[in-house]
Structure formats: C-alpha cells, structure tokens
A protein has these predicted regions:
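A short beta-strand motif characteristic of beta-propeller blades
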Residues: 58-64, 101-106, 143-148, 185-190, ...
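Residue position within the beta-strands of beta-propeller blades
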Residues: 84, 126, 168, 210-211, ...
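Beta-strand-rich domains and repeat architectures in extracellular enzymes and scaffolds
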Residues: 62-90
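Periplasmic c-type cytochrome electron-transfer domains
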Residues: 240, 249-260, 265-279, 286-289, ...
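Short, solvent-exposed loop/turn segments at conserved positions within beta-propeller repeat blades
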Residues: 87-88, 129-130, 171-172, 218-224, ...
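Residue-level detector of Asp-centered blade-edge/turn motifs that repeat once per structural unit
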Residues: 77-78, 119-120, 161-162, 203-204, ...
C-alpha cells in the first residue's frame, strides 16, 4: 500500500524509468513525446505539485506598489535643479539641489527612459519607450506641452544647438528619428545597428553620437564588434560609424572639456565568450571598462578615422560590473563612472588617466587589470543599481540615480566622499519581486563581483552573443544567449533542455558554473525567481492597434499552420511549424528536438524548442546563433527541410511567414 505522496512518487519514477527504456529507440521521432512522454510528464507534475519546496516564488503578477525607479538625471544650467526621470513611476520630477526636496513632478508616457533639455533650458524632452512617444514638458511649470510620435522604443534623445531638431534613438526599431520641433513631425530616420540607447550632442554642436547596447550581427565564433554612430547635424547625414572591437553594451557618452582634447568616454563591457568559461579570476569571463574615442571631425563623411582606445576599470582581484553612467567635471579634473551592478561610483583623475594612456601601448590597455589603480581616486558606495550621473557646474557635486532604491546619491568630489542621499519618495516596502530585481542586478554574488545576471541580460533581454560554456568536452557545444522576457511557463531551460525549472537554472547551476560562489540562498533565490517569472514582454509593434492582421500576416499565418505543401503533398506532423511551436503554450512545445542544426562542434543534436513571443527582437537565432536573421533560419540552414518544410516556398511566401512570426 502506498503510504504517502513520496512513496507514490517513487513508484511513478520506477514506472517512468521503465517507460523511458521502452521508448528510447524512438526518441529520434518527435511524436513519441506527445504520445508517451508528455502524459508521463504531466503525471509527474500532478503527483509532485503538492510536495514541500524550499523556494516559493510568486508566479502570478503581484500587486506591486508604485516604485519610481529613477533611470536618468540631468542638471539645469545653473545647477539649482535636478531633473530625475522615473521609469516605473512614468514621471519626471524636479529636485531642488539646495533643499534636496522634490519640488515638481509631471506624468509622462509609459516606461520613460531618456531625458533631454532644450538649449534655452525652458523645455524638457522625455522619451517613453513603451509608448513610442516623446513628452514635451515645460521646465518652469512642469505642464505637459505636447506629445510627439517617434519610432519604436525611444530611449536616448538630444536637441541640436539651435533647438529646432530633436534626435531620438529608437531601441526596438534600430534607428534614430529626426523630429522637426516646429511642426512636431518626424522628418528623417537613420538606420543604426542594434539597440541604440544613449546619445550625446558634441560641444561644438556638429555631431550627435549614438551608442548601441548590442554588437553587430556577425559570425558566432568571432569577437563581437560594437558601434558608436556619429551623425553630422549640419548635413543631417551619417558622418562616421566608429567601431569598438571586442565589446558590447556601450552605455552613456561623455565629452571631455576642450582643455583635455574633447575626447569621448563611453562605458562598455569586454566579454570573453569565445574561450571555455572554466573560471572567473583574471577577467576570464569578462571585464568592464571604457572606450576613449578621439573623433576625427575633419575626416571625409563616411570615413572611419576616429581613434579608439580601451581601458579596464576593474581591479586585479575585484570587478565593477556593468559600467553605465559617465560624466566629466566641467573643470576637467575628474570623470565619474557608475557601475550599476556593483553599486559603486568611481572617481577618476583625468590627468593620471592620460598618463596611463601614454605609458602603456593601446593594444595592451584593453586587457590590463593593473590600470585602474593608477587613475581611480576613490570608489564610493551608492544605492542599488546606479545608472546615470550628472556633475554640477562648479565641479563640486556629482549626483547619481539609484534605480532600485528610488534615491539619488550626492557625492562631494572635492573630498571624494558621499555627502548625502536624496529620497525621491518611493514606497518603503520592498516586495518579493522588487527584492528579486535587486538580486538580478547584484554582482556581489559572483566571485570577485565580476558580473550579475543583468550583465549578460541587459534590459532583462540578451547580449547578442554565443558563449562557450564549461561542458564535458571543453570548447564544444557553444550556445547563444537567450532572452528572459516572458519566460514564465516555457520550461525546460538551457538549450539542451536539462534544467526542468528556473530554480535549477538559477540556483545550483549559476552558483557552480557561472558565479563560482555559494550563489543565492533559498530566500534570495525565491525572490529572484519571482522577478524572472514576471518580466513582461514589450508591446508588439508589428500588430495594428485594433489587433487585426495585415493581408501579408494572414497569409503568413496560413503558411505557419499549413498541413500540405504547395503541390498538395502532406507535410508530416513532426515537420509542421505548429507541432513544435503550438500557439497555446507561447509557441513552444517545451521539449527538445533535432532540426539538424548541430555542427561538428556540437556533441548533441537535440535542442530545446524556443518560445517565439517577440521573436523579432531575439537575433541571432538557432542554438548557436549562426542564423543572423529570421530569414536565414530557412534560407541558409534548412536546405534539407529538417526545420519545417520550406523548400517549396516562394520568396513571397517566406516573406509572409516572417511577417506573421513578427506578430507573435
């Protein structure tokens, strides 16, 4: 007689073991999962669902208090007001720098990410990433003046010196919109590379610089290359595409004062994704630093002649993950850089930095871990997740937004110490989900603080790389990073599908193979899983406001769900799109299959079926990132019809299929 649920579970496991032995010869066919293993899996879930678990994450969207989540900060020209942009508060506020009190607040669009001030200081421009708009706010009254349409996912923005044109970086659209401020209409659009976020107008007003978070799409077995786009504001053309090799995640941009030569400082990350990730020390997995760029403003348009030098901001035995915000003091003596996943702000001596650049060859600087000690004056603690920084006109004070603390850290640059903290008035209760987001951005859980979860998943997304993880056969089974958006109910995890749930994925696995530390305790892991289970999907820009599909999307939908080829031949069930990607389960059947995408470097051909929600944001594709676009999945890597039947399709049909996939 079965005494309790655990005894029953043991019997089920015995039955399952026998069943697997029985069907093992059939595992190469996908249908065996549906008819044999799936019922068994469901039975297991039913039997064990009531068992005690040390980790209890919330898997339903919690009723969260209205956190502010400050992400961007600017100073008025006279230094009397701080303008703070709050991502979750959907607001921009003004803070008096003397009283350190919030004195004004305006409600803007959804998920505001970027903030700019007009040349005359009378108008604030706020980009609303999920509304695809810019809110124009009167800086004196904080009244909303008008709302301007942009491209998809606006983040960074700047006005030209005349105040006539607004430049807006559209992160989802991979573009920059030029908006005529007299009419409020978009007059031009530039194509960028991947996920443009931060922007800067040069001091002379001749150029707008645009930093991209994700690297160029390229061969998965080659080092990444990121890009800083330079736009000519007079001719409104691309002036230069400045390449920054071996890097990803270009963040804020700061321009040095003329006395220092006017070089640009751009925080970045240098991933070491091509070598097996067998350790953390000595910057083995990644380092964090800056690009020093000397723009070639006199070079012919389109000719890349700017000089790029990289320098590491980490120490030999400790790292400062995810450099984000950067600013120079107006007197040029100091530069300030925030490390958002280390909760640190670093004060740099620019004279010593220049000396270091003279002493060490540029080709060495990018990987030298003994540089920062020569020019970092002080590392100061901030609140949680410092993102943006601004320096007062008198070069005395630096103001740092603490994204996950709803506060601003005030730094005394003269004495190199934290002077005070400005409370922006957010909720004091720290919910399980908020705590989980703090865990997600906490590099302290990694050995020597080298990285956090967010370091490889910027914006809770992906980094565009394929990583060479530690596997039994080192150097093989390289896998592409995957997005974390909308991952609830898409288990199992990993490309090999071996992690049955997020607790396994983010608990022992991360501690052993990534952090090389004790990792999270049960309470912390539960909070982290709550956050991961509630990462939302961004609005789908490919669907019309009324939800109706276009004619091309409807045709693509018919192709996705088709059961026969163009000549009337039946498509086997295991080779139909919706067999592996059923609509009712986020377009993933949640098991592994073989579509013959394995290369000679893979030890296994079975790979987890990815979910397709917002798949248009998830390039590169396939388990190793070989397919750079959705089209390449079939035009380059499906010549034998092993990944769905597509060889009979016309180019127009493939285009329609892609159009439908973008609606998911």
């Amino acid at each position: 007689m079965i005494q309790d649920k655990r005894d029953f579970g043991e019997r089920i496991l015995e039955y399952g073991t026998g069943l697997i032995k029985l069907v093992k010869p059939l595992l190469k066919t996908r249908l065996v999962f549906h008819f044999c293993l799936l019922p068994f899996a469901l039975c297991l879930l039913t039997c064990f669902s009531g068992m005690a678990s040390p980790i209890n994450p919330q898997t339903t969207e919690p009723n969260e208090p209205s956190y502010l989540t400050p992400v961007e900060i600017k100073l008025s020209a006279d230094g009397k007001k701080l303008y703070v942009l709050c991502e979750d508060g959907d607001s921009v506020m003004a803070v008096d720098t003397q009283t350190k009190q919030v004195v004004a607040k305006a409600t803007v669009g959804h998920k505001p990410k970027g903030l700019a001030i007009s040349p005359d200081g009378k108008t604030l421009y706020v980009s609303n990433e999920w509304s695809d708009t810019v809110t124009e706010v009167d800086a004196a009254t904080f009244a909303v003046k008008r709302i301007l349409k942009t491209g998809w996912g606006p983040v960074g923005l700047v006005s030209d010196r005349s105040g006539k044109t607004l430049y807006v970086a559209n992160s989802i659209a991979d573009s920059v919109s030029l908006i005529d401020l007299a009419s409020g209409a978009e007059i031009k659009r530039f194509v960028t590379h991947r996920y443009p976020e931060q922007m800067l107008l040069s001091r002379d007003g001749r150029r707008v610089y645009v930093a991209n978070i994700l690297p160029h799409l390229g061969p998965y077995d080659q080092p990444p290359v990121s890009e800083l786009l330079a736009l000519d504001t007079t001719k409104q053309v691309v002036a230069e595409r400045i390449l920054v090799p071996g890097t990803i995640e270009l963040r804020h941009i700061a321009e040095a004062p003329p006395a220092l030569g006017g070089y640009l400082l751009v925080p970045l990350m240098r991933p070491k994704n091509l070598g097996p990730l067998i350790q953390v020390p000595q910057g083995w997995m990644m380092t964090h630093g800056m690009a020093l760029i000397r723009p070639a403003t006199t070079a012919p348009l389109g000719v890349a002649q700017s000089k790029v030098t990289q320098v590491v901001l980490d120490d030999i035995d400790y790292y400062f993950a995810t450099n984000a915000g950067v600013a120079f003091s107006p007197d040029g003596r100091r530069a300030v850089v925030t490390s958002s996943d280390a909760d640190i702000v670093s004060i740099l001596d620019t004279a010593r930095l220049a000396q270091r650049l003279r002493e060490v060859p540029a080709e060495e600087l990018a990987n030298r871990l003994d540089s920062a000690v020569t020019f970092v004056v002080k590392r100061l603690p901030t609140g949680r997740n410092p993102t943006s920084v601004a320096v007062s006109p008198d070069s005395r004070w630096a103001y740092v937004t603490n994204r996950l603390d709803d506060s601003v850290t005030v730094v005394d640059l003269a004495q190199a110490k934290v002077a005070s903290t400005i409370d922006l008035g957010g909720p004091k209760e720290i919910t399980l989900m908020r705590r989980g987001e703090q865990m997600f951005h906490a590099a302290k859980y990694c050995f020597q603080g080298q990285f956090a979860c967010a370091t490889c998943h910027p914006n809770s997304h992906l980094d565009g790389l394929a990583w060479n993880l530690e596997t039994p056969q080192l150097g093989r089974d390289r896998v592409a990073n995957r997005t974390l958006r909308g991952i609830r109910e898409t288990a199992p995890y990993k490309w090999n599908g071996k992690n049955p749930d997020l607790a396994t994925q983010c608990g022992p696995r991360i501690a052993k193979y990534f952090f090389r530390s004790e990792g999270f305790n049960a309470e912390e892991l539960g909070a982290l899983l709550t956050y991961l289970n509630n990462i939302p999907l961004a609005p789908n820009r490919h669907i019309a406001p009324d939800g109706q599909l276009t004619e091309a999307q409807e045709r693509g939908k018919a192709i996705f769900f088709r059961q026969s080829t163009n000549d009337g031949g039946a498509i086997p069930m295991q080779n139909r799109c919706d067999t592996c990607h059923p609509a009712e389960t986020h377009y993933t059947a949640r098991y592994s299959t073989d579509v013959k995408s394995a290369t000679k470097y893979d030890t296994n051909g079975l790979f987890d079926i990815p979910q397709l929600d917002r798949v248009y944001e998830d390039a590169p594709y396939l388990h190793n990132g070989e397919a750079l676009t959705l089209e390449e999945i079939w035009t380059v890597f499906n010549n034998q019809d092993t990944h769905g039947v597509t060889s009979d399709m016309s180019k127009e049909q493939l285009n329609d299929l892609i159009e439908f996939l973008k609606t998911l």
